[in-house]
């Protein structure tokens, strides 16, 4: 979604970026973009999340293994001097900010630059195989296919306001080991991600049709798990940004 409503004082912009640049943004306390390199005469922020995510996934991830989508607001009074450029379809809109203007551009950022999504590259077979051997069970086939795609959402905000982190098989194994005592109360559990707080996104690997479920870290068993969506539908809604946590509806034993 872009912010071109002329009645607002700020314009919301998005920028795809890689690890090196986002580390420099973090070093600025999330207040400024770093100076352009000599071979980078133009700074390209874009006007919607979809386009930023497309670049992060198709350009940043293949080249650096990770791609980020950021969001920030810029004063309209400053930005109005630059025309909006259409770089393809009607949705492909961006600004071209000359490198020598970046200092002034940064001064007109209101608030902080926010990371809204991180994408990672395909997980190798070896990592899946090692985690499954250690756990003695398999991840859902649809989950493996998603994490072995060109780029998958590792963490980020949904358009619904939900925030989630999805785990690589190795991280899932580590979390399962740390959660060992509670995991014993959830036979067959496979941890797919977290809800950003105390909640884990899990599946019961004993049932190939089991949905993704939400459990508290202090859960005393599957009876308190809250079903979310079938694995394939969960992935589809994560990809669309429409996933929303369901907090009620625990499984009845």
Stretches with model-predicted labels:
Residues 2-32, 36-43, 50-118, 198:
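Conserved NAD+-utilizing ADP-ribose enzyme module
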Residues 51-52, 140, 208:
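General alpha-helical segment detector with a strong preference for membrane-spanning helices
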């Amino acid at each position: 979604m872009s912010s071109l409503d002329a009645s607002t004082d700020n314009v919301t912009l998005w920028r795809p970026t890689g690890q090196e640049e986002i580390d420099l943004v973090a070093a600025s306390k999330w207040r400024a973009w770093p100076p352009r390199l000599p071979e980078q005469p133009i700074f390209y922020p874009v006007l919607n999340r979809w386009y930023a995510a497309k670049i992060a996934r198709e350009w940043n991830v293949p080249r650096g293994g990770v791609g980020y989508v950021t969001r920030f607001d810029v004063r309209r009074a400053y930005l109005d001097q630059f025309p909006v450029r259409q770089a393809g379809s009607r949705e492909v809109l961006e600004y071209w900010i000359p490198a020598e203007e970046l200092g002034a551009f940064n001064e007109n950022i209101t608030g902080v630059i926010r990371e809204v999504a991180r994408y990672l590259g395909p997980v190798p077979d070896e990592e899946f195989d090692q985690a499954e051997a250690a756990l003695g069970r398999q991840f859902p086939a649809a989950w493996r296919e998603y994490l072995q795609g060109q780029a998958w959402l590792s963490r980020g905000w949904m358009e619904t306001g939900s925030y989630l982190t999805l785990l690589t098989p190795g991280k899932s194994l580590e979390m399962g080991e740390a959660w060992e005592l509670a995991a014993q109360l959830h036979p067959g559990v496979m941890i797919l991600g977290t809800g950003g707080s105390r909640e884990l996104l899990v599946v019961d690997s004993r049932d190939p049709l089991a949905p993704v479920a939400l459990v508290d870290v202090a859960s005393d068993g599957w009876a308190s798990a809250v079903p979310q969506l079938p694995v394939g539908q969960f992935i589809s809604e994560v990809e669309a940004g429409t996933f929303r946590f369901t907090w009620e509806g625990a499984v009845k034993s």
